[in-house]
Amino acid sequence: VLNDNAPKPPSSIYDLEVPILGICYGQQIMMQMLGGSVISGSGTSEFGKSYVKLNTKSKNIKLLEGLFLKEGKEEVWMSHGDHVATIPKDFEVYGVSENAPFAIIGNEKKHFYGVQFHPEVFHTLNGKVLIKNFLKLSNFSFNWSMQSYLQQSVEEIKIKVGNKKVICALSGGVDSS
């Protein structure tokens, strides 16, 4: 985030009026692009197991439903050198860790959220709950199945191919089809 050539999304992404969840670097770049700041970790890096404590004002945040039920803290997996130093004025702090004062932040009105930890890894014990909550906020449909994917794919192929013939080459390898 702090390098001049650091990758960043187009700023127009924040105008799409869709929920956004920035994870680790994603949180940092979102904060920097929206008016917050990021600083180098000098002495405040976190790698491995950490605990995020809930800000007591954050009890009714939909992103956090079903979380922080045990002593108001969650075990998470951190892996960062840099961290957010300031957040834009329209964001709130939902959770903090020992070295990340903005471990969970959000803007409920815009449905923009950021976490400094990694909910996608199994080391974050309730990471799947957080991700599922975000998907609910995004109006994600939970009815995907391999069968529905297969049906949809077959229909799309029939539309594309019509009455023409096709050749399908398929090997039996696990990762080659």
Q: Which role does the model predict for each range below?
A:
Residues V1-D4, K8-P19, Q28, Q32-S177:
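RNA-binding accessory domains that recognize and position tRNA/RNA substrates
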